[in-house]
Each structure stands twice: as structure tokens, then as C-alpha cells.
Amino acid sequence: MPSPRPRGSPPPAPSGSRVRPPRSGRSPAPRSPTGPNTPRAPGRFESPFSVEAILARPDPCAPAASQPSGSACVHPAFWTAASLCATGGLPWACPTSWLPAYLSVGFYPVPGPRVAPVCGLLGFGVTGLELAHCSGLWAFPDWAPTEDLQDTERQQKRVRTMFNLEQLEELEKVFAKQHNLVGKKRAQLAARLKLTENQVRVWFQNRRVKYQKQQKLRAAVTSAEAASLDEPSSSSIASIQSDDAESGVDG
């Protein structure tokens, strides 16, 4: 009959099996499961692209205590730029380098667009859709250089054609016969005088206007001369008065 074993002692190994003695007096510590929040052992290098490193990264869209409540997920650099502008760390303007790439798109290359305390970024919750409608966010200072629209809209002055004496004489001869020259005749005259059809057309148009003015002036002069012939002259009136006076004296 086997003797009773003491309490707490390990059970006897079966016959025929080899028993490995422990390497040390301490029992091996149980392995702890690796999780996303498990601290890494010092001295061990892990790749930042490993599964554990990716899972251990904090959510970039998690609400921070320094950002306004109810705001959308906005890059932290945007709030940093707005806070620096509001607290006086920078002047009224913040350069576009303080903003992330997706917010700085669309700025014109002028120094200092106004980004500082607009739409209550530090006091009220602003969503991503409201940022596009904020007045002053995309505004520019009054002294910013702007393109002069009047110069672009101003029509260029038409270059006046200089005709030589031979061309003017030929044009006057044709105008004396026909005041309006169109079609094939105008093309032939332009080719003969080494001019374009547009130049000939403009000359005839201006010549007709001049001719109408001359006709009106001649009509006015003719009417004035006719009126002067109908009225008695001052010398005839004086002679009539003197004759009346002499006849009165004789009577």
C-alpha cells in the first residue's frame, strides 16, 4: 500500500516518462495578452506601421477639451492659428502656412488673408459647411492690390487710317458720282487704292455725314441771305426819313 503524499506536493510522474528539473527555483511568469493599450517593453523597437501601433493611435476626430463643443472634425492646426490670432500672438492677419492644405486652397497670393476671430470660432461651434459661408474668412484687406476692371473693359481706340493725296482724290471722284458704294464696286475700288473694304466703307460713311452737315449749312446761309434781301436796308430807311422831313419843312 503506497504511503500518503503530503498536501501541496506535485503528483508523481508516471513510469517511463522523463522528468525535467526546473532551471531555477522560480516558476515561469504567465504571459500577458498583448492588446492595444499594452505598454511596450523598453528597449524593444516596433514599426509605427504595425497593427499594434495603428490600433494604439488616438482618434484624430475625437473632441478635445480646448476645442469648442459641437464643432466638426477640424485639423488642430486651424484652431492653433485662430487662437494665436485672437490672443494677439499675431497681427490681424494669419498667413496661409498656419492652415492645413485643404483649408488654404483657394487663397489668392496676397499677404495676409483675414483668418483671425471670424464667425466666433473660439466662442461658438462652427461646422465645416458654415466655414464656407463665414463673412470675413475669405476676405482681403482694403489695401490688397486688385485688378482695374475699367482698363480691361475699356475698348481700344480705333486706329485712324491716313490716306494719301492720290487716294483722297480718287475717293472724292467716286463719291461725287455715287454716295454709297457697296458690293463688288467697293471691293474693286479698295483693291485699286490698296486699301481694305472696311477702310473704304468707313470713309464713305464719314463722307456722307460730312456731306449732310454741309448741305444743312448751305441751306441756313441761303435762307439768311433771302431774309436780308426782303428787309429794307438802313441807308434806304435814312433817306426816306430825310425826304419826309424836307417835305414837312417846305409845307
From Swiss-Prot:
It comes from the Eukaryota. The gene is NOTO. Residues 1-14 have a biased composition (Pro residues). Transcription regulator acting downstream of both FOXA2 and Brachyury (T) during notochord development. Required for node morphogenesis. Is essential for cilia formation in the posterior notochord (PNC) and for left-right patterning; acts upstream of FOXJ1 and RFX3 in this process and is required for the expression of various components important for axonemal assembly and function. Plays a role in regulating axial versus paraxial cell fate. Activates the transcription of ciliary proteins C11orf97 homolog, FAM183B and SPACA9 in the embryonic ventral node. SUPFAM superfamilies: Homeodomain-like. The keyword Transcription applies. It comes from Homo sapiens. This is Homeobox protein notochord. One of its GO terms (molecular function) is RNA polymerase II cis-regulatory region sequence-specific DNA binding. GO terms for biological process: brain development; central nervous system development; dorsal/ventral pattern formation; embryonic pattern specification; heart looping; motile cilium assembly; neuron differentiation; notochord development. It is found in: Nucleus. Its main location: nucleus. GO terms for cellular component: chromatin; nucleus. Gene3D superfamilies: Homeodomain-like. InterPro entries: EMX-VAX-Noto_Homeobox_TFs, HD, Homeodomain-like_sf. Residues 156-215 bind DNA. Keywords: Developmental protein, DNA-binding, Homeobox, Nucleus, Transcription, Transcription regulation.
